From Swiss-Prot:
Keyword tags: Bromination, Calcium channel impairing toxin, Disulfide bond, Gamma-carboxyglutamic acid, Glycoprotein, Hydroxylation, Ion channel impairing toxin, Neurotoxin, Presynaptic neurotoxin, Secreted, Signal, Toxin
UniProt-recorded name of the protein: Epsilon-conotoxin TxVA
Organism: Conus textile (Cloth-of-gold cone)
Cystine crosslinks: 52-58, 53-59
Mod. after translation: O-glycan consists of the disaccharide Gal-GalNAc.
CC annotations in GO: extracellular region; host cell presynaptic membrane
4-hydroxyproline: residues bearing it: 63
Propeptide positions: 20-50, 64-67
Family named by the database record: Belongs to the conotoxin T superfamily.
Tissues with expression: Expressed by the venom duct.
Function according to Swiss-Prot or TrEMBL: Epsilon-conotoxins act at presynaptic membranes, blocking the calcium channels or G protein-coupled receptors. Causes hyperactivity upon intracranial injection into mice. Causes dorsal fins drooping in fish.
Signal sequence coordinates: 1-19
Domain notes: The cysteine framework is V (CC-CC).
């Protein structure tokens, strides 16, 4: 239990540390914003498909009944 306050203080110090890149930026670096946009678009599409499949009217992968 003596280590717990020290652990909390270290967590607070880590969270309040200024953000910086450990590596210097080179010409090869790709900005992450297009990758994040693609990820958001993919997740949004998957969620729309899942909602659609729950309704059962547009899901092409729905199991066939009567087998």
């Amino acid at each position: 239990m003596r280590c717990f306050p020290v652990f909390i203080i270290l967590l607070l110090l880590i969270a309040s540390a200024p953000c910086f890149d450990a590596r210097t930026k080179t010409d090869d670096d790709v900005p992450l914003s297009p990758l994040r946009d693609n990820l958001k678009r993919t997740i949004r599409t998957r969620l729309n498909i899942r909602e659609c499949c729950e309704d059962g009217w547009c899901c092409t992968a729905a199991p066939l009944t009567g087998r």
